[in-house]
Regions:
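Mature catalytic domains of secreted/periplasmic carbohydrate-active enzymes
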Residues: 2-473
């Protein structure tokens, strides 16, 4: 969640949003120029969805005129040529100019909305401090998240590292569909008060839950280790070192993995940083040890890697994947390093980082987060595909979707919550599932579940209907 406390505003002509230092070019790695760390010329505004009450880091918008521009000071260790990607939103055909001290690159937007757009050619930078600018060459409605620069001398090596990092996603492509549950210490029973932490974890019936999942024919289960609060249902020491009392003695994750694996289902862990201040009651001082800062992420990365490495080593091949939410909290970050931590104990583990409505934040991941992706295929292409998204903001990743089947939200975190009926008719479910099957996209149906492990009978019946479509029985 966004640690910046600025309100949404435009910057006066020629005025910096903040006196940010020059950006240092990273050797053999990605260098990111953030739009909210640029000098802004014009009436552009920083967008914050919730008025900066959270810690999400969004983008700069209200970019409409050719006389508006972004400017960064970039320090290069030597003369070089750079490949440039833009994380940008607009309309197809709109032309953008990226200028350095020696040359300019002109690129035309390809997608309607957000995209990760590779600029043609290479941007030349001189040794020392360079002025890099971005502007539109025609009036349009545009948004900018960032520019990503890679030294062309390093690009082949980085591409090889990406190729070596990626895991085989065939099992996910062939799984057809799975279940997702945002269930944890934030939950409530159908009626009455919730249990204190970790009583709901201690009382959870793993075998009954796994039997229910098996009835649906699901190929995998996405289980939320954290979400509305940060209480982890396993004895992870790295978490206790940062936030004492936020883990527990029962290894619910390990038991779930064993029970699901025994029934032919894989386990994917959904992980959220848990910075929901109003709900969780964790002070910013308490989380300061986790180091969530937009401009110095070393402490955060160390904490993230120590936690995910311990989890990964503990469960090994039992843990098939990670679904890491709210990438807007930590992008830009050393996602290659974080990815290696996420794959600790199982090099074939699949990982995904959420980029909200924006394009992929890193190539060091395996599948598309796909939040709310129940209506489209996000560039997966025509029927008969292999599941890999061919074009657009998630290009190169395995197609994946997670969406609410019933609701009213992703999980139950308030007393007396009533589960809605499934939001789809059987005809709609049939069309949705067949579209995904024909393109090998993995569909993840999110069901609400009460504290005792019970779900809506209507939702369960709908999932059994999905089983008949996909499994034929």
């Amino acid at each position: 969640m966004l640690t910046d406390d600025r309100s949404t505003r435009g910057a006066p002509q020629g005025m910096e949003l903040e006196p940010y230092p020059p950006v240092q070019i990273q050797s053999n790695d990605l260098t990111v120029l953030m739009s909210d760390r640029a000098k802004i010329y014009g009436g552009m505004k920083y967008y914050a969805h919730d008025g900066n009450k959270s810690h999400k880091r969004f983008w700069v918008e209200n970019w409409t005129n050719t006389d508006e521009s972004f400017e960064w000071a970039v320090v290069a260790p030597q003369d070089g040529r750079y490949h440039v990607d833009l994380l940008i939103a607009g309309a197809p055909g709109v032309k953008i100019e990226i200028a350095g001290p020696n040359n300019k690159l002109i690129c035309a937007l390809q997608e309607n909305g957000w995209d990760k757009l590779a600029a043609p050619g290479e941007l030349e930078l001189r040794k020392g401090t360079n002025r890099v600018t971005v502007k539109a060459l025609q009036a349009a409605s545009l948004k900018l998240k960032s520019l990503e620069l890679i030294n062309s001398a390093d690009k082949e090596k980085i591409d090889k590292r990406i190729q070596a990092f990626r895991s085989d996603t065939k099992w996910m492509a062939n799984a057809g569909y799975g279940l997702m549950f945002q269930w944890g210490g934030w939950g409530y029973p159908q009626h009455g008060p919730k249990k204190p932490w970790p009583k709901m974890i201690d009382d959870f019936n793993v075998e009954s839950f796994a039997d229910m999942c098996a009835e649906t024919g699901a190929g995998y289960v996405v289980w939320s280790a954290t979400w509305m609060t940060y209480y982890f249902p396993a004895p992870i020491k790295a978490i206790a070192d940062i936030l004492p009392g936020r883990n527990c003695s029962r290894d619910l994750i390990g038991e779930l993995a064993d029970a699901l694996n025994k029934r032919g289902m894989k386990l994917i862990l959904y992980y959220h940083l848990g910075r929901w201040w109003a709900k969780d009651g964790v002070s910013q001082h308490g989380w300061a040890k986790n180091g969530l800062s937009q401009d110095d992420q070393n402490l955060f990365v160390d904490s993230f890697c120590s936690i995910t490495t311990e989890v990964g080593m503990r469960y090994g091949k039992k843990l098939a994947g990670w679904l890491i939410d709210d990438g807007m909290i930590y992008y830009p970050a050393p996602l290659e390093q974080m990815g290696k931590a996420l794959k600790a104990g199982n090099a074939e583990r699949l990982i995904s980082h959420s980029s909200y409505v924006m394009p992929r934040f890193t190539e060091f991941q395996d599948y598309f987060f796909g939040e709310g992706n129940e209506k489209g295929n996000y560039g997966a292409g025509p029927k008969g595909g292999d599941g890999i998204i061919a074009i657009g903001p998630a290009k190169g990743l395995q197609g994946f979707a997670c969406f609410i089947l019933d609701g009213p939200d992703w999980g139950i975190y308030e007393a007396e919550t009533k589960i809605n009926p499934p939001q789809f008719t059987r005809d709609q479910i049939t069309a949705l599932v067949n579209n995904a099957l024909e393109r090998k996209l993995a569909l993840s149906f999110n069901l609400l579940m009460y504290e005792d492990g019970s779900v809506s009978p209507e939702s369960l019946e709908m999932m059994k209907y999905v089983r008949t479509i996909v499994r034929g029985k």
